[in-house]
Amino acid sequence: NHGPRTSQGFRAGPNNIFFGAMDAVRDRPGYSLYVETDCVPVRPDWLGQINRHLQGAEPAWVTGSIYRGPDALGPREKRHINGNAVYATHDPAFQHFVDTVWRPRLAELVVQHPELPFDCVIEALYELADGRLATDNPDWELMRHASHKFRYSALIPNLAGSECSLHDL
């Protein structure tokens, strides 16, 4: 959060790389695995395990890990699915969600929260969604219809800042 602040927030670089990657693979068949440069495989046959999981799983737009490290997290981070995840880039409905919700809502939210990364936007939308207002709250309506498309998985563990042993996985 201490880098240069632009109109796109402190994390403009990583956010733009993510959306650029989503654009680059949008017309390719299948799923896409997005892996940032600070991530490494930690078990044999990791890619095969991910592929086998996708073959048997109910279709999801995003499959990834909740934060499993020891550090305290704020409200927009506590349940977010880490960006190092599998994305249903072949699904036109997912691409529509990226184009009409994810990217534009990030652009809106970074004005007030310049530290917001792309992978915390969904959690931020949950924070804004007020189910007590039901259909009078567009964020609640949106998340009520899209929530089942976001899945937690232990296949790509988010252990940032952790002293966790690989045997714990």
Please state what every model-predicted region is.
Residues 24-30, 52-60:
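Secondary-structure boundary elements
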